[in-house]
Amino acid sequence: LPTARRESSLQTFLPTLNLKYTINDANSIRFSASRTVTRPSFIEMAPFLYQESYGSAQIRGNDELQNGYNYNFDLRYECFGKNGDMISLTGYFKYLDSPIERIQALQGGATLHSFRNADNGMAAGVEVEFRKQLIKDLRLGANLSYMYTNVKLPEGGAYTNKERPLQGASPILANADLTYSPRFGEERQLNLALLYNLQGSRIHAVGVSNLGDIKQQTLHTLNFSAGYDLNRHFSLKLQVNDLLNRNVIFKQEVPSTGTEVEVERYKKGTDFEIGFSYKL
């Protein structure tokens, strides 16, 4: 059988710079800059058709994908209080060289998804985060971010929208967690956590050849975890994912009318994990 071989260089210069200015014991400012690499995954590069666990589209990898390079700049203000309380404000900017995006096309009347490198793109946004102890052993944490993205497409390409947000990037992201962690003696501890996530509408697959972009609609998820340390060695864990079990909904733009139509919806279901661990 014929085989294809693809080699990717691991010799990449990835510098990082971190600076911190301490205003006083409670307040500080941090600045960071870095160059990172996004390498194509095996699934994104494998040149054969496969079916995802969820959804109806078939996917074919692209063995001509190139590494994407990211230039990241972050400025963060932090204020710390008593009992681990904290509030922070972060502004960030990212320049994306050859970002990898998921695209769609029609093949024999069926929808086919694959992957391509865009020319370049950018992302800029702000994030607010806080942690607060409400009462003893009960803590609340949350963060909210807004992000603007834009991508430049190859000249003469078949993309339907010549200017648009970056595929896979949600403009609004929010997370909140409520944790309760009482101790019973020196070794036993209970850990309960309720975790909420909001992911704003985002492009799931980029439209080409007059096909509109497919967008995943805003999604809310709620998870629960519980753990109990019996002693220094033994612990129990329970994880419940997606308590809300909301529909994952996809809508596609219709370029000729400027409207959207629903093309797919499914539920992933609620799943449970129970674990037992032993530490030496």
Predicted regions: what they are:
Residues 17-21, 75-79, 126-132, 142, ...:
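Residues on the lipid-exposed face of transmembrane beta-strands in outer-membrane beta-barrel proteins
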Residues 13, 21-25, 69, 79-83, ...:
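Outer-membrane beta-barrel strand-turn architecture
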Residues 26-29, 83-87, 137-140, 185-190, ...:
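Repeated loop/turn-to-beta-strand initiation elements of outer-membrane beta-barrel proteins
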Residues 33-39, 46-48, 79, 93-97, ...:
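Transmembrane beta-strands of outer-membrane beta-barrel pores
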Residues 96, 197-206, 228-280:
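C-terminal beta-signal and adjacent terminal beta-strands/loops
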Residues 1-96, 179, 195:
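Structural signature of Gram-negative outer-membrane beta-barrels, strongest in the C-terminal barrel
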Residues 92-95, 114-205:
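Gram-negative outer-membrane beta-barrel transporters
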Residues 60-62, 66, 72, 79, ...:
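Outer membrane beta-barrel strand-and-loop segments of large Gram-negative receptors
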